[in-house]
Amino acid sequence: MAVLTHGSPTPSGAHFDGKGINFTLFSAHAEQVTLCLFDEQGQERQIAMPARTGDIWHGYLPGGKPGQRYGYRVSGPFEPSRGHRFNPHKLLIDPRTRALEGKVGDDPRFTGGVSQPDVRDSAAALPKCLVIHEEYDWQGDKPPAIPWGNTVIYEAHVRGLTQLHPDIPPELRGTYAALAHPALIEHLKTLGITTLELLPVQFHIDEPRLQKMGLSNYWGYNVLAPFAVDPDYASGREGISPLRELRDAVKALHNAGIEVILDVVFNHSAELDVFGPTLCQRGIDNASYYWLTPDGEYDNITGCGNALRLSHPYVTQWVIDCLNYWRDSCHVDGFRFDLGTVLGRTPAFDQHAPLFAALAADERLSACKLIAEPWDIGLGGYQLGNFPTGFSEWNDQYRDAMRGFWLRGEVPRGTFAQHFAASSRLFEQRGRLPSASINQITAHDGFTLLDLLCFNQKHNQMNGEENRDGSDNNHSNNFGCEGLVADAAIWQRRKACQRALLTTLLLSQGTPMLLAGDEQGHSQQGNNNAYCQNNILTWLDWGSADRALMTFTADLIRLRQQIPALTQDQWWQSGDSNVQWLDSQGQALSDAAWEQGCQQQLQILLSQRWLVLINATDHECEMHLPEGEWEGIPPFGVSDHAERLTTWRGSAHTICVLIKRD
């Protein structure tokens, strides 16, 4: 018969010390916490936690070993109007578990209990927490420590990036192991990618609504266990755990000089709204973990049914501990925070919020690359430019300005230039560096680059929501024909804009983020919200990749790394050597010229040597070049002999870079 001794309130979670397992669980409002141990046959033993220190319940299991399955039952008041939803009939997952065994199905035993406790026991249906204790030989692994000024981010999904790669063994495709495969690493190195940003690899589940439709949460933002590696992306090879496989991938990428950033989800949990499943925090301490309205309802500022209360001292520490676990255990180099405004809610957004202060005070985490998606859907949720020093931010204003300039002819060149210069009005006056602007034309959420040029309307019918989901504000242009089938003239204009947008992204000041597949011409058939499409719609089709576009993109990244104005991560100042803004005649743009409607032509001289020529009009133009001898540079052509170019004739929707001869 298992007996728990008092144990210790630290360390948090379930930890094997060589002689037994120490268990801890936070709950400020519980009246009793019961540890539930399960054997291999699923038989349950319930043991009351024998000690409480402050709000930490704890106990020690002598002789306990790694592999022990467990969960919790928590007793206390069921008073929804006060935010309390305790129910000992529901087995609960440890919010700090580092592994889970099993999946969460659409089981009615998880739901119910909206106005009164549901008495159906959920233990048989719930995945069990696993105590793990895995040693790992990092073999001297060190972080690549890429300076922000040299950083080029590649946003990718583990499965989508590798599932159809012909040079990766079939049994490894779609897995963490595929990320470590030489063929994938060679692609990243050839492109010039410095930093791989992975969509969530934390343990996530599929919403009941999707399960009923036979779909799944492909993107993975419905996180249940943020400390646990998602086993869905593991190869299942004997003797190799999901954690080890991810570690192997990070080590291989580091050996190639490539950083790894994880997209993490701390804005909401997989328990959804009041009608959602009771799996974890709702039953452990609902009032502490979630933002609630005065009458106890969930304050749905995320659009996902609930919002985590990250200003609570314990919840703040839970996030910090989780980030440090991923950093220490998996050697990741940074984090991208989904719906990042929630991180600073107190409940209003505050640059000095507890979580921001804790991140700044943590030497290890403050040295990581930290990236915020600077919005949520709550009051005051749009916070682009307002995150504290140490954060970079996804810049949707850059995205919309560049799309509008090239595809809609509705953005004046002054606005274009301001965002080309790392959206300086947003970041410079707030003491941030240019790298704080994460520039993007596309991301996982929205059209791919090719679809941006082929579809004026979203086509999300496969998502099962009658095309209601996804944004209608895409700033796209199909050039007169909806879809991928079009005549040669339309495709010529599309391809010109495709290259112009890639060039703009990769030669703008700030930190560029390239969506995986955009360099290949990947299409999602007009679906701009493919969160539930775990199929060939989202998987990159390496067999039909546009090789010429891949070469073009690689040449652009190499060019970027040669231009000091783009890599030194310092603001451009009027009159310095970093930048000169010129008109189509090669003359400095006057203040009046900046304000002349939607002028779509300009020249940008970077570091006194690289001349970016821009014709975003729908007709050919001729530009007079500044004084000097100019020649083409890859990927824009190379002169076979010395030639003094005085003019440049540019086709519609084109951009070109020339280099000044010494």
UniProtKB/Swiss-Prot annotation:
- A Gene Ontology molecular function term of the record: glycogen debranching enzyme activity
The UniProt keywords, alphabetically, are: Carbohydrate metabolism, Glycogen metabolism, Glycosidase, Hydrolase
| SMART domains noted in UniProt | Aamy
Q: Where is the active site?
A: 338 (nucleophile), 373 (proton donor)
Family annotation (InterPro entries): GlgX_C, GlgX_Isoamylase_N_E_set, Glyco_hydro_13_cat_dom, Glyco_hydro_13_N, Glyco_hydro_b, Glycogen_debranch_bac, Glycogen_debranch_GlgX, Glycoside_hydrolase_SF
Q: What is its EC number?
A: 3.2.1.196
Involved pathway(s): Glycan degradation; glycogen degradation
The reply on keyword Hydrolase is yes
Instruction: Indicate the annotated site residue(s) for Transition state stabilizer.
Output: 445
Task: Establish whether keyword Ribosomal protein is in the entry.
Answer: no
Task: State the reactions this protein catalyses.
Answer: Hydrolysis of (1->6)-alpha-D-glucosidic linkages to branches with degrees of polymerization of three or four glucose residues in limit dextrin
Q: Might you name a Gene Ontology BP term for this protein?
A: glycogen catabolic process
Which Pfam families has this protein been placed in? CBM_48 (PF02922), GlgX_C (PF18390)
Highest taxon of source = Bacteria
This chain's function reads: Removes maltotriose and maltotetraose chains that are attached by 1,6-alpha-linkage to the limit dextrin main chain, generating a debranched limit dextrin.
Q: Which family does it belong to?
A: Belongs to the glycosyl hydrolase 13 family.
UniProt name for this protein: Glycogen debranching enzyme
Give the source species: Yersinia pestis
